[in-house]
From Swiss-Prot:
Residues 33-336 form the PPM-type phosphatase domain. Residues 106-115 have a biased composition (Basic and acidic residues). Binds 2 magnesium or manganese ions per subunit. Disulfide bonds: none annotated. Residues 96-105 have a biased composition (Polar residues). Belongs to the PP2C family. Mn(2+) 2 binds at residues 69, 281, 327. Keywords: Hydrolase, Magnesium, Manganese, Metal-binding, Protein phosphatase. The keyword Oxidoreductase does not apply. PANTHER family: PROTEIN PHOSPHATASE. This is Probable protein phosphatase 2C 73. It comes from Oryza sativa subsp. japonica. It holds the Pfam family PP2C.
Amino acid sequence: MGICCSKGKEELEEEGFPWKHDAFFHDQLWSAGVSMHTKQGWKGANQDAMTTCQDFAGHKGQIFCGVFDGHGPLGREVARHVRDVLPVKLSSSLALKTEQDPSSNTDKETLEKSDCTSLSDTSNEKQLLSTWKNIFVKTFEDVDEDLRQHSGIDCICSGTTAVTVVRQGDHLIIANLGDSRAVLCTRDSKDRPISVQLTTDLKPNLPSEAERILNSKGRVFAMDDEPDVPRMWLPDQDAPGLAMARAFGDFCLKSHGLICTPEVYYRKLSAKDDFLVLATDGIWDVLSNKEVIKIVSSATDHSKAAKQLVERAVRTWRRKFPTSMVDDCAVVCLFLKPSPSSSESTPGDAKPPQAVSFTGSFRKVLGGGGGEAEEGTNVWRALEGVARVNSVVRLPRMGAVLSWRRRSTSLEEDDEARID
């Protein structure tokens, strides 16, 4: 699958790994133009996770990055499990798709032969977008099913978001689930850095999300003391009050409109694009897209950009909301141009392989449950300076939990009967 770096210093120390290898991991990450950092908030264990995989799926120069924001009693375990399993399953799905359909344009040789200069070949473009959408959607569903059957992690009221990206040469394919976010830094006509939000924060109050939830007998409303924070609730209980409309896990809500289907996006990179920031809502709740881009752009040492961004977010939490608990933060910064230091240290590196032959500047493939958003339209965002809340308000009563377990057991018995 490639070289992966997923675990922070604290997690490695928990597992008895000597942190004397810090410099090695730092160099390995930065050789791929990646800066990543996470910091525990004031709510207990750090439930955020992140990962980066170089030479992903066996393709030289291809990279996978992801951040995951866990919630609920076992949110930490869910986020770590998805972090470890998702890249493996996605890599396997890519390999299987290439083996079954060599013309799918997901393998290196086909991609290099693809004509990606024509904007008029819309049918081929749609086919490619559809191929990537299907791969991501199937992989996310497999990971969610893996969680459902996991005997060591109770995911009834625990789950995680995920925002992931695969970079293949000049092409970005992004898959988003929940309210973590991907933001690109590009340059305007005067060479000034500007932010472009590439994902939609999938909150319960988005019209398409709310419609799906209500059609499944779920409920969407905000509590009196949090009028600006819409939440998702069970039909007959004011629980769990989930602050997002899509997530891995949270199986008590999966029959009531919560889905694990990601929205899949595509962007063709240009010479004006500088870097991509993936981050959990601990960042976006206190810093705007513009502020994040400014902080990362101003980092004199790009390899430390993620750490500086997290530290700024923590200071902003304390200054703006002194009575609120600082949230966990996780950031991955993917720099899209080689730095002078990295190009000097690796002069013999091969040119990254050509990639998915998508055309156009920015396109989105919906993974279900939403309407198509045209380029340049406004996107729903996390509430800046307001969403200082837990992702889950309260756990449902035992009756709802037992009901979910009965449905889950029934599904497993049906599957076994069909196999027999």
